[in-house]
């Protein structure tokens, strides 16, 4: 058993102890003031109801613990000259982080109107959770934050992502005991198996056991000390326990424990960096057990409050109906003795402010928490040199994501010295055809490596763990601290991080409008092994709905690309890696597929995002009878095959073929910056001709994006309609009416002059579908005429 026990408890001198306790009191005072007050910030007159906000919003319970940790981290940063940032997993303790950045001076530097005096304090208090003010959590508006902590579960993965390739950085990561019950958090403890002390920084997890969630005890606070200790030893940590409710001994124990943990981190790093990493180290962590709502009211209306769930939010909430609560609030706030903490102007006393680090060592002003400041452009090879040779459209085959993998291999190679590019994925890098990366780097692995293992090493730059949540959290932490990356995933299973994507998109949207927040590298997804080529794994693996989810977010931060072949995928990939402050979703196939555009045509097509394919159309100089649009690699294939059928049977039918790479082009320009104007949309799609649209995903998404268009009523969309099983590739499109025969049938139904004259052709199309079913049931594969089809014109 690992024994982690602190014997020494006299780390702080009497003067240090008194000053640190005073600093903590000041942070607690400011935190309570933010929740309750909009006037009389220093209680220079008796507190009255009109000084109190009419709507009381915020969370007190976790806040004193967050403040306690912050003041102790300040001391160790000063003593050891540490480069450290703070992640508050319980981000609902927002008043505490705002209070601490105000006390250290950072907040007023970022927001000069919140000055370091009584008037500034009044504004600080009033703005919190107030219309026109700031949110209640550790939101992007909070200096020093890379993690809002609104949706719980991601603190630890964000912390590790931040320290990868940041050898001097330490992230103090506070994990709430409620958050510790979430699935993503439980898995993310394993991130220590991927941390290389030679090249990476360190995470100091601080599990804050205050015992309660909103209305229930927490699991980890109620299990025995021995079981809790063994749990974290099993995770590979060396847990130190700091437990108490009495101020002086808890301060002393926390100080001694932090000194020990920092010393152990430095020793681990020194040994690895001088002798090389050999075995995975056992990193220290702290388990801090203090009362929920510490220093707050013991009881409210005769009911237990401190050290109980009732302190979670606002202990005194009925101020207007219970005047005695106003008096009790005043008593509570005066218990912090603000007259001993702030001078006559309302400025924090200099001797106390001196406890905070200076300049960029302040956790609120650390550049790593505003990663765009540190962001360096990737060194990019010329993607055009990776082009697939396409002498004639629709006649040669290539694996699009394998070509992309070759390009990413050389992006990785070009940036090895900068150490600012990583790949993440849930054990799918090779499956998704990014195997060429392993010619340059390996998978990160800090545990035992056997001779027969495949591409594992301690200095690998491909991060694989079978947890989409952890992959997403690592990448977000990496990007938020000023680096670049790509996440490849099976299309159906990216849904596991739907809500994580939500939170990151909200962060990007908000920070776009905060002047001091610098743009960061985009979060790039490759979604492959997609719905139309999951015929082998079956229905559970077939879901293209992530893009529906993505387009719900603000247009200013999301982009969705569906390149139809390898050269368009190369162009899109280059664009995504150069872009800033977006979420880019790229959907592409990994199987051998027909190639349509040479590199010059691909660049032009991707730059426009949507376009008429002249080589596939025959309406030059005249109005088309029908528009056939496609978006996605398989819909493109089936559309072109349908065009072939129609041209063979109706040589005089004028067909316009449109391909969409940038899905957001379909929206009006008033809704998305990439959207087409109505004039341009009508020019391409016509204002009145029938449109048969073959789409990669759920068909109603196209209707959502185009419902304001003049010709919307004539747009008929085919896509995935939740039909699937383990079958052949072509049968997948047949089951969803997206196949070439059904698309040709749709055209016949919608072109008036064909409706009643093409009955024989319609019957032939139906016969082909019957023939298809008979063939696959007998042979277990698609008909040769389907498998081997190429563009014949």
Curated annotation (Swiss-Prot):
Q: Which residues form a coiled coil?
A: none
One Pfam family here: XFP_C
Q: Which InterPro entries match?
A: Phosphoketolase, THDP-binding, Transketo_C/PFOR_II, Xul5P/Fru6P_PKetolase, Xul5P/Fru6P_PKetolase_C, Xul5P/Fru6P_PKetolase_CS, Xul5P/Fru6P_PKetolase_N, Xul5P/Fru6P_PKetolase_ThDP_BS
* Swiss-Prot/TrEMBL cofactor(s): thiamine diphosphate
Q: Does the keyword Amino-acid biosynthesis apply?
A: no
**Keywords, sorted A to Z:** Lyase, Thiamine pyrophosphate
| GO MF | aldehyde-lyase activity
Q: Which GO terms describe its biological process?
A: carbohydrate metabolic process
- Give the similarity note: Belongs to the XFP family.
What is the recorded name of this protein? Probable phosphoketolase
Its source organism is: Gloeobacter violaceus (strain ATCC 29082 / PCC 7421)
